[in-house]
Amino acid sequence: MTSPDFSNIKHDMETVDFEQFRQIINVANQSLPDCIHEFFDVPGKQHYRLLAYLSTLYNNTTIIDIGSHRGNSATALSYNTTNTVHSFDIEDKVLNPAIRILPNVQFHLDNLFDLLVADKWKDTILQSPFIFLDVNGSMEIDFYNYLKSIGYAGFVICDDIWYFKEMRDNFWYKIPDEYRYDVTELGHWSGTGIFTLNPDIRFPKRDNSAWTLVTAYFNLTKCPDASEEIIKRDATYYFSHSLSTLALPYNLVIYCDNESYPEILSRRPEYLSSRTQYIIREFDEFHFKKDGVLLDDNFAKYRDQINKNRRNKPYHFDNRNTASYYLFCMSRYAMLKETIELNPFKSSHFCWINFCIERMGYQNLIRLDEALSIKRNKFSTCYIDYVPEPLVQNTEEYYRFGRCGMCSGFFTGNAHYMYKVCDLIENKFLEYVQQGYGHADEQLYSPVYFQNSQLFEHYYGDYLQMITNYTYIYDSPEPPIYNFITRSFDNANYVKCVEACEFVLKSYFLKKCNMSDEYLNELYHYYMEAKKHLHTP
């Protein structure tokens, strides 16, 4: 089976004339207008144009569609009328008579996940250059193994690889990275992936080999200051949300305690062993480093000091933010500095990613690969809430509440900028502890930034968009407007206000996000007024 050239697939998809389906879909769904819009929606929102395009790459052959549902995928696959589409489902849900009578589509009530049934269709499967798979995440891996066992030489398009945790954990992450491709930007908003066991079939894939990502898990429920909130989020909780980080197909350094290591080792896919470095250390054994020298006090000593500071200078904070939790957050910077020094994968760029990043939503998982491909050099993090510089300089007032302006769950930079900013954050921590304060690592970002703004490159969003909005505002453009743009304007930081406005506007004009007229007008207002203050056209 000769493989087509997929290198320009995004451009080539534009040649598909989808209007030929207009009458078929309209006739079918007069009472369901959303179904009409769904079918004709653009790549990245719906996958039907991708399926139609792929059908044009092969002639006079058989295409398999597993999961007929309403018949829309079979309809798209029927675009090239020289091919025959065999569409399978265990229930008949094709209500559209125009779809049912398509001359090159045959619908079957058969379960191809039953291996006895699959064997009945084995010859047809082997003849099919590609298969479309749209089911539920519980049986796909068995079908993958079946295709592997019979020597299937085509490729399989899979729907919903990101949205459903079952699809991610039980299927997508179990396929070695060398065999799979994420084509969500060409397919469905919920995640579209392609896998193939044929080394001659290759789809475009970003090269993110220059990165080392760092993550960590320590069981803070064992710490002497574990609060009820900490205990509720025990090891079971974090491990249940860990696979999206542990299955990342990048160079990954994992810090953990001895107790957690076996469980983490079992969850990191074996095919990624060559891209994995484990550093095992008990939590209280961490030390900060100042001017290149490890300080004498370990985390146990700092925990006592932070608790003393909080008694002497009480403030309002979340009970989950114990002194040990604060120190865990601070360990990020010590771990990144150490990783940069060791540099086991000879990387140029480094990234912190939370162990349980999937809790922030599937869209962050979708956008991670694109975010890394940008290869920003400066320290880059999500600016969430503008805290004015005069308030930051008033340390006593600043520390009355947990005022956190930037996100520490995901941040990036090259070796130079990452090490420099991590070092500055550590130094600022030590400075505030000595002054009798201590809240959270994110509260250290603003004072470091205002003193070293040249080291930072921001993007904008809220916690749930800490990766999603790295390149563009893909989700929720409103929080940057009311949390950052309005507040930076009100506090006369017109440079950052304009920067944030342009970041949101660019995303909107490139159709990366939607925005109501109300918010768009508000955005324009602040943008134009801020530019007036800067005397820029």
Range-by-range predicted roles:
Residues S324-Y383:
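GT-A fold catalytic core of metal-dependent nucleotide-sugar glycosyltransferases
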Residues P479, N483-T486, E522-E529, H533:
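"A position-specific structural signal for the A-helix of alpha-solenoid helical repeats
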